[in-house]
């Protein structure tokens, strides 16, 4: 008391000396103190109002703001003095408040014992039930002659004193400087005084004071229930909840001296225990001290060791109760809490406590099923209902992180586990309950947190059960694996999910959209679906059991770290999922290399499958030692869609790898076989006998298509495996009109060094046809009978397949097709004005012939196009320059018998008989028809453009004879359905041979085709003055009814007329587009051979076929009236 201020000394002396102290003294003193504090509190606000500055929200924030703020410069008028005064007032205000709180604390420490024994006993709370007391009227007082030793304050053993304090009174009364603390004594003292309590029989154990340690987390204390009229004050820092069967603990006043040192042993305090319900059973002070000291030492030492380095930033574990002694907190953070006895919380207090606890995240472990008192004494272990206290949320900023850790299933920190072990030592005999009932029924948490805690505890229990099950399965290896049962670790990874859900991730190869997948692979197991139903966690091979057992070994080590391992496993699986999703995208784009499949095969070979696993999972390698990878079993963690796509990609990759090499090898073999055929004679090709034509046994080309093609469309190819020896038979077998060929050619032209045919001299013009069949344009529309019969079936719509060149044709187009049936018997008589045949190359590339035969293989009746208005003419007698046959695309089932003209010219040097007979046949036809061939100067360009696959043959032929180019252009014009009358009047005199009829629906042409035809038409119209006459649709239809009789010129003329009308339409349509290139082609027409220029035209393809209908409808009458009289007159003159 020597250090007290002067006013306080006077007050304390007067209060001690006077026998009866009235409450008004304390009221006056407190009123003055609060008035002073209120004045200092409002002083800054007044200064701010005068300075037009808004007041700060709270004293603490205002203090920090004002201390750090510097006076700003003047803004137009002098305000510096006012601000300085306000700053000074604000700085002095906290000091005044601190002094006020110090005075109050000292006053409370001085007046505490007197209030206990005197009139202010009600400030300390009601008497315990063990104390028998009566209330006396106001104004009664106690005698002041009692010894002062009895008035010493009582200190609870749990409230360990602060080392920096020197007086024991400050333990329970030292307030923090902040205004946020709560003073129970001050609040109760400011209220009207209540009747004091007097003891009729003063007991040596007066009511004890239990000062609560400030900021002590979760203190569990036991105290008697309060009286009915008592309402407990609210506590800010902690909410007191006590069990129902704890005894009240009271310390005798005479056992605790005033000079008690803060560091004295706790055993010096000898308390007395008073029973409930008025029972005054005494417990020996020594036994109580020993029990209290033992429990408190264990508790305090364990907590100090773990939390000594953490003061305000203590991390509260979600599953632990961490108590922090008073000595670990700074004096500034110690709230001023008056020493009040323990009490039972009313329902209102419980509701208030629950509201405080909802903001926190308390979790209790089974180690804290028994509550603890403030003094450190453990309550009986039979009390299973735990009521915990949680610190405010502001003291634990780490709680959201801990909550996330709980939700994510992360392992607890090591410090938390250590603390849990320490507390489990203090309560070793706890009852074992179910994991789902760990938390008490009345645990003050929100329903959401309750569910999360129950789920977390349930997961821990299931994981422990799964570990036990794993150990049991390890003792009996091979039983569950042999039967295909799920493995134990599935329950730990799936966390409660059934094995059926994991087994739904399957990939069945038999459900692949490709129906021939099983035929392609051939080695796919038949019962893959049964294997898919097996456990997806199995690894291939018998050694998979050992590897899986090795993977499960770490899981059996420690149950406390299973959550961490599970988290790591999930992380690995997530990485694998991301990797597989990235690879899946590459797989869909076709970027997976061949090494991926090799890695799969290496994995399968590394794990040999036993007989037992073959029965269950059907993963045994097939006979060809190519294991069928089950993606659902190896990659069970992937999504079903990802597994299905990946499996389909693997199957396609295998099929491609299996069939890619045979297809690459097969093509050279076919070319080699076709090379042998190129040396065969062309006698039968030029003019086969009726017997040969009728017997089509070996004429058809056998097309081999791979059975069980893989799903990839690129692998579906048709290959010619057995080409027949007789090319004409093979090309004409499917056509019944081949029987009309009964005449054999007679002439044989001479051959030069290069094996090409030489043109005969003027005397040999009789057996040389100047051009393959050139149709007369003077025939009537009623004279075409046989051709109509042949093309009558062209009404059946059939797709015209673009075909490559036919074998033995050196420069033949890929789409060359011959409609040669009725024209074979036509022979032109040996005229003196027959043009030379183009020089043909003998050499033939076998690789080119491969594509030719493939084209011929599809020349069957089922693939003819719809062409009712166009007759069909055989192309076997048409001679082509440089091996190009102006074959018209097939329009009916006669297309299979089309023979390209190149066969007749590309003969070997030693086989001249075929060409001789062919020349005789052509000359006879020319004599019967009496027409002259038109010439075509675009032969050379078209030959080069239309046959890019075979450039070397026709290039060297073009340099020798310019007539060859003209012959080619003439045959090119045969494909087009139009022909100008000017061309026919002048050029038909040269060569009127067999021309091929085009169809309206023709296969697509090459880009150079149209350009060559345009050039040809421009040259024709530049030299001619006549306009083309249109061909009526009637004339085209009547041509079908034309019958060709070998040797009759009348039928030949009629046939030529029909063909000429079609050619006129093409030429008239293309004339407008080729007017710019007329001068360039005139020179080619100026070089006649034997007095007759040679004109040939390339086939006219689909892009020009669309123009036929328009030309036929617009120029019917004009072309018909102009062309026929002139042509008939020319034919009669010859």
Curated annotation (Swiss-Prot):
Point to the regions of Polar residues compositional bias: 489-504, 773-794, 937-948, 1111-1124
- Name of this protein: Spermatogenesis-associated protein 31C2
Species name for this entry? Homo sapiens (Human)
- Which compartments does it reside in? Membrane
Q: What the protein does?
A: May play a role in spermatogenesis.
Sorted alphabetically, which keywords does the UniProt record give?
A: Differentiation, Membrane, Spermatogenesis, Transmembrane, Transmembrane helix
Q: For bias kind Low complexity, which ranges apply?
A: 185-201
What spans are recorded as compositionally biased (Basic residues)?
Answer: 59-87
Q: Does the UniProt entry include the keyword Transmembrane helix?
A: yes
Q: One of this protein's GO BP terms?
A: cell differentiation
* Gene name in the database record: SPATA31C2
Stretches the record annotates as Disordered: 54-87, 115-243, 477-504, 524-561, 727-807, 928-1007, 1111-1134
> Which residue ranges have biased composition labelled Pro residues?
204-235
Keyword Membrane on this protein?
A: yes
**Record-stated family:** Belongs to the SPATA31 family.
């Amino acid at each position: 008391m020597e250090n007290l201020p002067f006013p306080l000394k006077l007050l304390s002396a007067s209060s001690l000396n006077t026998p009866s102290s009235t409450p008004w003294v304390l009221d006056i003193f407190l009123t003055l103190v609060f008035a002073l504090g209120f004045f200092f509190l409002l002083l800054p606000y007044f200064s701010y109002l005068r300075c037009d500055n808004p007041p700060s929200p709270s004293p603490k924030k205002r203090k920090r703001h004002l201390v750090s703020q510097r006076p700003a410069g003047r803004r137009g008028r002098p305000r510096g003095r006012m601000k300085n005064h306000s700053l000074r007032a604000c700085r002095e205000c906290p000091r005044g408040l601190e002094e006020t709180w110090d005075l109050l604390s000292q006053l409370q420490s001085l007046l505490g014992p007197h209030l206990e024994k005197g009139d202010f006993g009600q400030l300390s709370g009601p008497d315990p039930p063990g104390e028998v007391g009566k209330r006396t009227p106001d104004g009664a007082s106690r005698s002041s002659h009692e010894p002062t030793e009895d008035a010493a304050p009582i200190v609870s053993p749990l409230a360990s004193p602060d080392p920096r304090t020197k007086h024991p009174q400050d333990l329970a009364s030292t307030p923090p400087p902040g205004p946020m603390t709560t003073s129970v004594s001050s609040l109760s003292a400011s209220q009207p005084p209540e009747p004091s309590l007097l003891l009729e029989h003063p007991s040596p154990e007066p009511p004890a004071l239990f000062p609560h340690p400030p900021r002590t987390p979760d203190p569990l204390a036991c105290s008697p229930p309060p009286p009915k009229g008592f309402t407990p004050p609210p506590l800010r820092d902690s909410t007191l909840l006590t069990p129902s069967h704890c005894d009240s603990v009271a310390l005798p006043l005479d056992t605790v001296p005033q000079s008690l040192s803060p560091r004295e042993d706790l055993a010096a305090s000898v308390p007395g225990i008073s029973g409930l319900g008025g029972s005054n059973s005494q417990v020996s002070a020594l036994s109580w001290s020993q029990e209290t000291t033992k429990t408190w030492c264990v508790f305090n030492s364990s907590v100090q060791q773990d939390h000594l380095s953490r003061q305000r930033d203590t991390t509260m574990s979600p599953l632990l109760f961490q108590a922090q002694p008073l000595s670990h907190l700074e004096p500034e953070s110690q709230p001023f809490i008056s020493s009040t006895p323990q009490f039972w919380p009313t329902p209102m207090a419980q509701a208030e406590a629950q509201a405080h606890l909802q903001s926190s995240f308390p979790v209790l472990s089974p180690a804290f099923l028994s509550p603890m008192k403030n003094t450190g004494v453990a309550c009986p272990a039979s009390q299973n209902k735990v009521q915990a206290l949680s610190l405010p949320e502001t003291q634990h900023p780490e709680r959201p992180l801990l909550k996330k850790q709980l939700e994510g299933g992360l392992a607890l920190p090591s410090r938390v586990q250590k603390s849990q072990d320490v507390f489990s030592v203090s309560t070793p005999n706890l009852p074992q309950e179910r994991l789902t009932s760990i938390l008490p029924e009345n645990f003050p948490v929100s329903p959401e947190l309750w569910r999360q805690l129950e789920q977390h505890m349930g997961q821990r229990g299931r994981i422990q059960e799964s570990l036990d099950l794993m150990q049991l399965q390890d003792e009996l290896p091979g039983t569950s694996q042999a039967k295909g049962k799920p493995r134990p670790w599935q329950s730990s990874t799936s966390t409660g999910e059934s094995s059926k859900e994991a087994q739904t991730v399957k990939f069945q190869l038999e459900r692949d959209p490709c129906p021939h997948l099983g035929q392609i692979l051939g080695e796919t197991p038949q019962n893959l679906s049964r294997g898919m139903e097996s456990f997806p966690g199995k690894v291939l091979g018998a050694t998979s059991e050992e590897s899986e057992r090795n993977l499960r070994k770490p899981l059996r080590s420690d149950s406390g770290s299973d959550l961490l391992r599970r988290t790591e496993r999930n992380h690995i699986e997530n990485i694998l999922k991301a990797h597989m999703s990235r690879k899946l995208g590459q797989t869909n784009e076709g970027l997976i290399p061949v090494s991926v499949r090799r890695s799969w095969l290496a994995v399968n070979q590394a794990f040999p499958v036993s007989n037992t696993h073959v029965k269950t999972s059907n993963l045994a390698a097939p006979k060809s030692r190519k294991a069928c990878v089950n993606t659902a079993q190896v990659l069970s963690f992937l999504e079903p869609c990802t597994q299905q796509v990946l499996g389909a990609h693997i199957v396609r990759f295998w099929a491609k790898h299996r069939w890619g090499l045979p297809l690459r090898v097969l093509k050279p073999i076919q070319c080699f076989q076709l090379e042998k055929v190129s040396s065969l004679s062309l006698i039968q090709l030029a003019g086969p006998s009726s017997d040969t034509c009728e017997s089509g046994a070996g004429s058809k080309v056998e097309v081999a298509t791979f059975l069980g093609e893989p799903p990839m469309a690129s692998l579906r190819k048709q290959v010619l495996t057995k080409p027949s020896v007789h090319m004409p038979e093979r090309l004409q077998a499917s056509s019944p009109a081949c029987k009309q060929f009964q005449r054999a050619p007679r002439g044989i032209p001479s051959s030069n060094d290069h094996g090409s045919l030489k043109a005969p001299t003027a005397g040999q013009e009789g057996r040389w046809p100047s051009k393959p069949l050139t149709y007369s344009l003077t025939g009537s529309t009623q004279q075409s009978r046989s051709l109509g019969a042949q093309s009558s079936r062209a009404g059946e719509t059939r797709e015209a397949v673009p075909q490559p060149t036919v074998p033995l044709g050196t420069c033949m187009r890929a789409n060359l097709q011959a409609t040669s049936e009725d024209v074979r018997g036509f022979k032109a008589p040996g005229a003196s004005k027959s043009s030379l045949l183009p020089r043909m190359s003998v050499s033939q590339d076998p690789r080119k012939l491969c594509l030719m035969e493939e084209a011929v293989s599809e020349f069957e009746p089922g693939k003819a196009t719809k062409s009712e208005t166009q007759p069909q003419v055989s192309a076997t007698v048409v001679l082509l320059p440089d091996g190009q046959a102006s074959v018209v695309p097939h329009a009916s089932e006669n297309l299979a018998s089309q023979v390209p003209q190149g066969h007749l010219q590309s003969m070997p040097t030693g086989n001249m008989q075929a060409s001789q007979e062919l020349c005789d046949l052509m000359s006879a036809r020319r004599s019967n028809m009496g027409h002259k061939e038109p010439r075509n100067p675009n032969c050379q360009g078209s030959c080069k453009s239309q046959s890019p696959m075979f450039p070397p043959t026709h290039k060297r032929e073009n340099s020798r004879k310019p007539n060859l180019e003209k012959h080619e252009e003439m045959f090119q014009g045969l494909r087009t359905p139009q022909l100008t009358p000017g061309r026919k009047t002048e050029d038909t005199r040269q060569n009127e041979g067999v021309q091929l009829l085009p169809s309206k629906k023709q296969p697509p042409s090459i880009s150079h085709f149209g350009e060559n035809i345009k050039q040809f038409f421009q040259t024709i119209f530049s030299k001619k003055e006549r306009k083309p006459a249109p061909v009526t649709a009637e004339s085209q239809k009547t041509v079908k009814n034309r019958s060709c009789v070998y040797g009759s010129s009348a039928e030949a003329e009629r046939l030529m007329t029909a063909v000429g009308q079609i050619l006129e339409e093409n030429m008239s349509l293309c004339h407008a587009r080729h007017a710019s290139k007329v001068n360039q082609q005139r020179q080619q027409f100026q070089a006649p051979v034997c007095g007759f220029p040679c004109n040939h035209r390339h086939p006219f393809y689909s892009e020009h076929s669309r123009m036929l209908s328009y030309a036929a409808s617009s120029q019917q009458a004009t072309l018909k009236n102009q062309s026929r009289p002139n042509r008939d007159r020319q034919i009669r003159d010859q």
